[in-house]
């Protein structure tokens, strides 16, 4: 096996390890297992919410901020895509029964998240004028 093949094999194994860790992260998030949910974050991780202009620095601050959320939340994963150091998760985050369509962009260093950026959007009613060109998604 040449160096390029070894690198590709390592990359594939690492990607699978990160994907497995992300599956565990989102399952822990949905189960409100705050400790397991945040194991994947680097000590100096940064979490950004561009829509509100907030930035949280440090794994403990991220964990404490999320643990203090007063609403009951649920996570429904639509898809996870990525490779290498960049991973994206699309999910529906439901707070007290109200859905928010969410995109999480995670940047990794090694096997830990060093930066996460999340965007949130409320559902909206599809306009009638587009009906002839679109399919309706039940989710």
Which residue ranges define each predicted feature?
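Short, low-complexity N-terminal intrinsically disordered segments enriched in polar/charged residues
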Residues: 1-43, 132-139
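A beta-strand edge to alpha-helix "cap/lid" segment located at domain peripheries
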Residues: 2-13, 63-139
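A structural signal for well-ordered alpha-helical scaffolds and beta->alpha junctions
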Residues: 18, 22, 59-62, 99
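Alpha-helix C-capping/helix-to-loop hinge sites
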Residues: 25-28, 47-48, 90
């Amino acid at each position: 096996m040449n160096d390029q093949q070894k690198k590709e094999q390592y990359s594939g194994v690492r990607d699978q390890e990160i994907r497995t860790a992300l599956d565990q992260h989102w399952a822990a998030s949905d189960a409100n297992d705050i400790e397991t949910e945040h194991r994947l974050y680097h000590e100096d991780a940064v979490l950004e919410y561009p829509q509100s202009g907030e930035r949280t620095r440090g794994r403990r601050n991220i964990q404490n901020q999320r643990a203090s959320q007063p609403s009951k939340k649920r996570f429904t994963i639509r898809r996870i895509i990525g490779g290498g150091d960049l991973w994206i998760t699309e999910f529906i985050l439901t707070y007290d029964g109200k859905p928010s369509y969410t995109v999480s962009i995670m940047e990794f260093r090694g096997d830990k998240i060093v930066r996460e950026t999340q965007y949130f959007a409320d559902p909206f009613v599809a306009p009638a004028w587009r009906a002839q060109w679109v399919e309706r998604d039940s989710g």
